[in-house]
Amino acid sequence: MRALRVQELRELGFPALRLVNGPLTLTLIPDLGGKIAVWEDRRRGLSWLWRNPYLPWRLPQAEARYVQEFDLGGWDECFPAIAPGIYPADPWVGTPIPDHGELWSQPWKIQIRIEEGKRLIVTGAAEGRSFPYRFERTLILEADRPAVRIRYRLQNTAEHTFYFLWAAHPLFPLLPGMRLLIPGPATARVAAAIGVAPQAMVFPWPQLPIEGGFLDLREPDPEGKWALKLFLRPAASWARLIHPTGAWWEIGWRGPITHLGLWINAGGWSGANTPPYQNLALEPAIGAPDDLGVAMREWGFFGLLPPLQEMEWSLQVTVG
C-alpha cells in the first residue's frame, strides 16, 4: 500500500504532481496540457522521456507555436489534429487548428483518487476552445506493477458530426544502439522526409528503399542527419523501444486506433532555429497523416464522432 503516493512539487517552475507506484514515477504538469514530463523506471534509475535542451519552459500564450516555442519534450496529447491547418467540414469549416492541436496549450483539470489502497487513478480533462468537445485521459497505476493503463474518453457536445485526428505524443532521446521492435509484417507509409530521399512512399517495415540500397529503421543512427515521419499498420497492436542497456518501454493499444505514427529525428530537423534534435516518438493514432484535411481528402483515415456521442480507447505502457 505504501507504494502508491502522490506528491505535489514544482517542475521547472510549474506546479506538478509526482505519481509513484513502486517501480514507476510519473511527473504530470497540469498547466501544460497535462504533459507527462517524466516517466522513470525507478528500478533501473532510467528516465525514458526526452526533454528539449534548448527551449525554455513557460506558459503558452494565445497563438503560441508548438514547434517553434513549445516542443519541450515529454508526452503531450495531440487533438483534433497534429499538423496546423484548417478544419475541413461544416459547420466549422475554415476554423484554424493550431500546431499539435488545442490540448497542449491549456491547463487541465485534474482529479485524483486511490481505490482500496491498490490503484492510483488520475484523470485529466480539457474542453475544446474552437470546437465543441470534452477530452478526458485517465492514468491508472497499480501498486508494485511496472505498467500504466491509460483510458481516453472523447465527448462530442455539438449537434453536428465532429471529424478529428488524435495521437499520443511521447518523445524519447535517440541514443546509439537504441532499437525499435514493431510486430510484422507491417506496411509503412512516408508522411514526411527530411535529409533522405525515399524511393518508395509505401514500403514493408523496416527497410526504407533509398538510392543505392535500403535504410534499416530498426536501429536508427543518431548521427544520420535525417528525419522521417511514418505511419504503420503493425501486425499486432503494440510496439517496443529497446534502450542500449537492454531496458525496454512497450506501448499497446485497444479501440479505434488506426495507425502507429513513428517520428525518427536522427539529427535532421529542428523547428525552433536550434541545433537539430536527436529524438523519436511512438504515437498510437486515430487517423493519418497529421493534417486533418489531407486525412479526409487523400488518405481516408480519420476519427468521426456523431452528434452528442462519445467514444473510448485505451493504451497500456509497460517497462522492463
Per-region residue spans from a language model:
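Asparagine-centered strand-capping/turn motif at beta-strand->loop junctions
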Residues: 152-158
